[in-house]
């Protein structure tokens, strides 16, 4: 009020009164007005000052919501003055306590100097003032308590020097803007501005970063402070400074509790489409929280929300369903951990977002609220919580098998635990390590993958159908396949010889062949990944031979020593024999076979390597393949070899210990085998040349070496390049032993054969059965056979050498109950996908018939029919290619009879059941190799990328062009062999429908595929072994081979374990084994032919049901769609097309499945994956199609109805999809067979050329299935059926399943079927099949077949549906539409 001077309120009033009249009376109104204006301005100024003096109540004045007027200010001033006076009067009566500085009743206003510190103490913070430039104008002294800085250290410094760099931008936003913009105070809101924000301030350390700039990041520590900022009005001036341009802040610590549970939790927003798929992520809010690692937080939160809510009371799907219905939804609280172990509690709230225009639901907007828990940064003791997948077996690669059995079992996901095979593996564990794992100490070279420890996704390797070829922990590289069968990755070790490990053979052995199909698939998978050989561990003892599982083809790191498992691993053990470990000999046998096949494949790559490899292959194959005893011998020998073989991963990847069932038998037989092997080794060690050894062996045994020698003889020089595995030599021994296993080397001629091994160190083992086309280039084995006596081309000799594969364990169907009949014989191939895939048998199966789709010679050498068990699948392909198969192969058509060794591995019982899991869908490899042997053995032998060697696979040869889907379907089809389709049909699902490929019925069809043309007609008299082994160009050469084999036998018999081991090394068997693993199938060589073989084998299952259809079914039974031959008749179709003259009539359409050979394991994997996916799609699509097909064929009412028997429960281990597919295949095959039988009768005079039904337009794909030549009308086959029987005849769509009554579906659509007679009634191949409910088949198949999954609509299985296949549907009424030209879709493949 001092500004008023002596004036008082009254004078002001009187002055005002005077002013008014003067303004009116004064003649100079302008002058008077100006004076009044000045006074008013002065008055307003004083009133503003007065208002400032009562600023304590400024907030009350602000409540006026208007600029305070003079009256209000004056009134408030008077009130406060009175209040002060009253307080002063009362204070005189108060005691000292009331006069304390802290008392609110103290005289006057609290002293500024004392008020500030008190307030700061109460707030637990410090005060600082920052100007608009960010310079600290003032800071309270207690800042030292918080930041360790002194007041003078911070004043006049930049606040940004103590702020975290990530907080500086936000801090700048909080600085006063009015001052910065120069906006006058009154233009702003009259209220004071305040806000709260958090920032991180640097705490001074002993060595301040301002003093020392080194290692600042390591030393800097920040304190999170909560700042309350206030911007003062412009009128507030102190000491000449305009505080309006400053921000006054009080900073206080944030407590741990507040930090952990902030009032405002972190959050981020995601946008989802109506299916719940993430469309957009808005992380701005988290990013602004300035917390490091917010990206990881978001990722983990979304993973937890979307992918780990299954099995919880809530799922994101339910959450969004609720949001869709109610518009809003929120999840319960869920938790996840960050990388540093901090636990975060989260909750998601979602809102349905609608299109503002149409109001249609557009998607969901989800806000995820995150709350970090206290003690936030604790290390996560459980890396698994972080999604870190600890290595299943932390042990060194050498200790891969070190896991305790229980651990192995735990890790082994034995989906097929019920399977004897899976049990076998578990039993195998008893052989020292869990899961037949080799002793804890693996060879140092063995690498253990985190998943090696029997992480069998499918079954343990042991499980017959599911168990991959003994995939166990040792197979780090095995691809884990979702399939029920243990995929190659299922048991990490599945191929390794380690006892617990399921070596390809081992697991198959464990599976007793039952696991073979899965094993084959697994091996196939492993091969595709190159996993097989690595399983082999260096053998602790020479006796222990780690036979590289070709199938495993795992890196040598995967090598596993089964030494610890002394018990023989009867590789060939039946499922029943799962307990006994697999015999090395069988492993060797498989190795030999696989090696041969692999060599053959290589041969396709190069004539030189092919010739050389053929020589070794012959030798190995002789050693491994001969005698039906093989399974039994293997079983028995496995015991002897057990120490070796159990430790040894057979070339087939069989761990002798892996087979559990045959320990006793293996021991007996193994003893003899071991003796022989020892002889051979001793001879070799003594410096005897291979020729000498062969002679000695022949002399010792008094037997001809083998016709295999004959086969090998033609390949005068075979250079087998294989990766050298330390255990290969031992594996070589295994092969030799396996050969020796066959006590009855029957070809005296072998004595005369003088093979020369230019490189003894080449490891025969390289011929390991691993399908992986790993060529062991480490060494080259050059075997020169000097012709001795002419070896009779008699297939019988080969049979003697290789043994009747049908009778042999190889043929035993692990899946089928018959496996027991075969006993240990079959297990080798069955159990070991590796064997199946790359086992010499497989190789043979695929290669031996140069022109034959299935390399009947190799597997077919042993008449598949002979096999009591329906050949599960290709596992016996090699067997099919074996001499007996060859016998049947005098004409490929005979293949059905003697060697429907097509990849189909015909089960004489008419079972298409895959021999093992290998044969099962999961195992295309053998099939591929077998099914699509190239024009020459080498090409035929070339392993399909998928592991065409796998006997159980109907894989079309890699070389055969074709749509991948077709390959895949074919592969699936192969796995779906009747056993597969029959689904564990121990006996032929169709009940020996056809005599299981009468010898005459298959040959042409099979040959067609193989022949691609006339090639299919390649000399029927050729021994399958010759074909497999690269048959000697001359009889003399064959004789030399036989002599050589005999000599080898003698040598091996006389050699001790060490000597045998040395011999193996000298022979380069280990190299061969690894090479076999490395060998990649030559796509060109097999191209269409491999598939046909696969198909051929399967037909046997169906052949029985339809009289005369055995061959027809084999050849054409599954040919159903000429264009579509891929599905079942693919091989046939291709063969027909390729050969143009030999429809694979004897072969099932599968035989025609020609999988293009993919040298790349990638193809194998792709095929496996496609199978799995394709099966699913096929199941879905086929079901839909089946439903459609029924109406399609009203005219052919019975056309599509499959007479499929419900698959035997054996396939319980198969995936439901696989089972369903197999069932469909069975149905389709039966239908086709039935139709084919009728059609053959009708069409015997008809040309083979494919012609879609009049009412059906063939799809382009039908024109060229699998990219293979369209099915040409083949000249009349050796079969009784017309050449185009099963090709042109309107068989069921290859794999078309009949959802509804086949007739109805097919006939309506295909009413004008080309078949002279509708297959309607024929459609129902058998009452069994009729019994199949369209929706569900009694078969263990988890997947109900669509109605009459048999509906032959190839479309059903072919993605062609009624369209592509429908074109043929007319034909398909009962006969599968001639879809040979149609490539099979991946779905079809599964049929």
Swiss-Prot record:
A motif (LXXLL motif 2) lies at residues 736-740. Phosphorylated and acetylated. Residues 27-84 form the bHLH domain. It catalyses: L-lysyl-[protein] + acetyl-CoA = N(6)-acetyl-L-lysyl-[protein] + CoA + H(+). It is found in: Cytoplasm; Nucleus. GO terms for molecular function: histone acetyltransferase activity; nuclear receptor binding; protein dimerization activity; transcription coactivator activity. Residues 857-870, 1300-1321 have a biased composition (Polar residues). Its main location: cytoplasm. Residues 112-182 form the PAS domain. Its EC number is 2.3.1.48. One of its GO terms (biological process) is positive regulation of transcription by RNA polymerase II. Pfam families: bHLH_NCOA, DUF1518, DUF4927, NCOA_u2, Nuc_rec_co-act, PAS, PAS_11, SRC-1. Keywords: Acetylation, Activator, Acyltransferase, Cytoplasm, Nucleus, Phosphoprotein, Repeat, Transcription, Transcription regulation, Transferase. Interacts with the histone acetyltransferase protein EP300. Belongs to the SRC/p160 nuclear receptor coactivator family. PANTHER family: NUCLEAR RECEPTOR COACTIVATOR, NUCLEAR RECEPTOR COACTIVATOR 3. This is Nuclear receptor coactivator 3. It comes from Xenopus laevis.
């Amino acid at each position: 009020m001092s500004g008023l001077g002596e004036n008082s309120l009254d004078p002001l009033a009187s002055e005002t009164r005077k002013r008014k009249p003067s303004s009116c009376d004064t003649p100079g109104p302008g002058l008077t007005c100006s004076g009044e204006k000045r006074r008013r301005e002065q008055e307003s100024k004083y009133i503003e000052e007065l208002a400032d003096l009562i600023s304590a109540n400024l907030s009350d004045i602000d409540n006026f919501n208007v600029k305070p007027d003079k009256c209000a200010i004056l009134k408030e001033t008077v009130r406060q003055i009175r209040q002060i006076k009253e307080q002063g009067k009362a204070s005189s009566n108060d005691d000292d306590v009331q006069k304390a500085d802290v008392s609110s009743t103290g005289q006057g206003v609290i002293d500024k100097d004392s008020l500030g510190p008190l307030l700061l103490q109460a707030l637990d913070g410090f005060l600082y003032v920052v100007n608009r430039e960010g310079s600290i104008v003032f800071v309270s002294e207690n800042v030292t308590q918080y930041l360790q800085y002194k007041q003078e250290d911070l004043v006049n410094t930049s606040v940004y020097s103590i702020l975290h760099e990530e907080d500086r931008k936000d801090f700048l936003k909080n600085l006063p803007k009015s001052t910065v913009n120069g906006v006058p105070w009154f233009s702003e809101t009259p209220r004071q501005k305040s806000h709260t924000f958090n920032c991180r301030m640097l705490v001074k350390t002993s060595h301040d970063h301002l003093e020392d700039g080194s290692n600042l990041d390591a030393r800097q520590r920040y304190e999170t402070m909560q700042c309350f900022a206030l911007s003062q009005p412009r009128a507030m001036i102190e000491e000449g400074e305009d505080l309006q341009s400053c921000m006054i802040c009080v900073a206080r610590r944030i407590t741990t509790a507040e930090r952990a549970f902030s009032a405002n939790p972190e959050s981020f927003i995601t946008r989802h489409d109506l299916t719940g798929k993430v469309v957009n992520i808005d992380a701005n809010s988290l990013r602004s929280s300035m917390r490091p690692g917010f990206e990881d937080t978001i990722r983990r939160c979304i993973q937890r929300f979307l992918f780990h809510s299954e099995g919880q009371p809530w799922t994101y799907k339910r959450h969004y369903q609720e949001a869709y219905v109610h518009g809003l939804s929120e999840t319960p609280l869920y938790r996840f951990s960050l990388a540093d172990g901090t636990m975060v509690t989260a909750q998601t709230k979602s809102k349905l977002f609608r299109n503002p225009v149409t109001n249609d639901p557009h998607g969901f907007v989800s806000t995820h609220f995150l709350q970090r828990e206290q003690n936030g940064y604790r290390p996560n003791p459980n890396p698994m919580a972080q999604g870190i997948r600890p290595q299943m077996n932390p042990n060194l690669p050498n200790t891969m098998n070190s896991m305790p059995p229980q651990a192995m079992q735990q890790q082994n996901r034995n989906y097929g635990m019920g399977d004897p095979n899976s049990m076998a593996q578990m039993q195998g564990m008893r052989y020292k390590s869990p899961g037949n794992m080799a002793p804890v100490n693996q060879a140092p070279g063995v690498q253990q993958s985190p998943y090696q420890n029997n992480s069998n996704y499918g079954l343990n390797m042991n499980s017959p159908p599911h168990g991959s070829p003994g995939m166990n922990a040792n197979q780090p590289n095995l691809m884990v396949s979702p399939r029920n069968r243990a995929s190659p990755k299922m048991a990490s070790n599945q191929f390794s010889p380690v006892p617990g490990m399921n070596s390809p053979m081992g697991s198959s052995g464990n599976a007793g062949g039952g696991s073979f199909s899965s094993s084959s698939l697994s091996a196939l998978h492993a091969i595709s990944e190159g996993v097989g050989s690595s399983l082999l561990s260096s053998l602790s003892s020479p006796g222990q031979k780690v036979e590289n599982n070709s199938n495993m083809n795992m890196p040598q790191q995967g090598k596993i020593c089964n030494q610890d498992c002394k018990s023989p691993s009867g590789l060939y053990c039946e499922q029943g024999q799962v307990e006994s470990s697999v015999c090395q000999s069988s492993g060797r046998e498989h190795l030999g076979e696989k090696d041969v096949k692999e060599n053959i494949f290589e041969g396709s790559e190069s004539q030189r390597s092919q010739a050389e490899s053929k020589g070794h292959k012959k030798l190995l194959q002789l050693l491994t393949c001969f005698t039906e005893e093989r399974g039994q011998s293997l079983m028995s020998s496995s015991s002897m070899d057990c120490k070796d073989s159990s430790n040894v991963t057979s070339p087939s990847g069989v761990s002798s210990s892996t087979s559990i069932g045959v320990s006793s038998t293996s021991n007996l037989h193994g003893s003899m085998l071991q003796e022989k092997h020892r002889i051979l080794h001793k001879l070799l060690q003594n410096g005897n040349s291979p020729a000498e050894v062969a002679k000695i062996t022949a002399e010792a045994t008094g037997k001809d070496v083998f016709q295999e020698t004959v086969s090998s003889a033609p390949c005068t020089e075979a250079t087998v390049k294989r990766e050298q595995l330390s255990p290969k030599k031992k594996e070589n021994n295994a092969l030799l032993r396996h050969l020796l296993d066959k006590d009855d080397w029957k070809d005296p001629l072998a004595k005369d054969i003088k093979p020369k091994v230019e490189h003894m160190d080449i490891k025969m083992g390289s011929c390991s059965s691993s399908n992986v086309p790993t060529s062991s280039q480490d060494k080259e084995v050059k075997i020169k056979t000097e012709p001795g006596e002419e070896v009779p081309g008699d297939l019988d000799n080969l049979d003697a050498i290789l043994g009747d594969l049908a009778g042999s364990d190889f043929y035993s169907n692990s899946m089928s109950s018959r496996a027991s009949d075969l006993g240990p014989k079959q297990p080798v191939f069955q159990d070991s996908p590796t064997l199946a895939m790359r086992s010499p048998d497989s190789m043979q199966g695929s290669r031996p018939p140069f022109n034959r789709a299935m390399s009947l010679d190799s597997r077919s050498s042993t008449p598949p029919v002979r096999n009591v068990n329906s050949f599960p699948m290709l596992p016996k392909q090699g067997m099919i290619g074996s001499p007996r198969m060859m016998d049947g192969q005098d004409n490929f058509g005979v293949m059905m009879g003697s060697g429907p060794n097509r990849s189909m591995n015909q089960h004489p019982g008419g079972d298409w059941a895959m021999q093992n899991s290998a044969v099962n869908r999961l195992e295309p490899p053998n099939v591929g190799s077998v099914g699509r042997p190239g024009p020459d053995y080498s090409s035929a032998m070339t392993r399909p990328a998928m592991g065409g060697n796998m006997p159980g696979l109907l894989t079309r040869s890699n070389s055969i062009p074709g749509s991948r889907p077709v390959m895949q379907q074919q592969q699936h089809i192969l796995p779906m062999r009747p056993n597969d389709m029959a689904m564990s049909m121990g006996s032929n699902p169709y009940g020996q429908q056809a005599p299981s490929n009468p010898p005459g019925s298959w040959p042409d069809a099979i040959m067609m595929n193989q022949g691609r043309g006339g090639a299919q007609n390649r000399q029927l008299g050729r021994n399958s072994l010759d074909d497999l082994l690269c048959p000697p160009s001359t009889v003399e050469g064959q004789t030399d081979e036989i002599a050589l084999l005999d000599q080898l036998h003698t040598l091996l018999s006389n050699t001790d374990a060490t000597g045998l081991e040395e011999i193996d090394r000298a022979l380069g068997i280990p190299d061969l084994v690894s090479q076999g693993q490395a060998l990649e199938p030559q796509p060109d060589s097999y191209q269409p032919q491999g598939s046909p073989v696969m198909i051929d084998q399967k037909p046997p299952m169906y052949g029985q049901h339809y009289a005369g259809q055995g061959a027809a079914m084999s050849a054409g039974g599954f040919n159903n769609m000429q264009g579509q031959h891929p599905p079942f008749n693919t091989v046939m179709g291709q063969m027909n097309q390729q050969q143009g003259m030999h429809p694979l009539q004897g072969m099932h359409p599968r035989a025609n499945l020609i999988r293009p050979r993919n040298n790349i394991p990638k193809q194998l994997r792709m095929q496996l994956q496609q199978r799995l996916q394709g099966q699913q799609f096929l199941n879905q699509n086929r079901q839909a199609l089946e439903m459609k097909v029924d109406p399609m064929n009203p005219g052919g009412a019975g056309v599509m109805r499959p007479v499929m028997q419900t698959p035997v429960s054996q396939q319980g281990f198969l995936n439901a999809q696989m089972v369903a597919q197999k069932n469909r295949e069975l149905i389709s095959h039966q239908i086709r067979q039935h139709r084919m039988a009728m059609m053959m009768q009708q069409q015997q005079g008809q040309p083979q050329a494919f012609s879609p039904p009049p009412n059906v337009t063939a799809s382009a794909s039908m024109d060229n299935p699998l990219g293979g030549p369209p099915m040409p009308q083949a000249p009349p086959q050796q079969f009784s059926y017309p050449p185009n029987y099963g090709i042109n005849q309107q068989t069921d769509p290859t794999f078309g399943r009949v959802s509804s009554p086949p007739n109805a579906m097919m006939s309506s659509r295909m009413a004008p079927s080309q078949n002279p007679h509708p297959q309607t009634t024929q459609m129902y191949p058998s009452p069994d099949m009729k019994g199949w409910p369209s929706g569900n088949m009694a078969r263990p198949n988890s997947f109900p077949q669509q109605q009459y999954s048999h509906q032959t609509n190839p479309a059903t299985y072919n993605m062609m549906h009624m369209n592509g296949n429908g074109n043929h549907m007319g034909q398909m009424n009962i006969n599968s539409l001639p879809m040979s030209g149609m490539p099979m879709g991946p779905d079809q493949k599964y049929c």
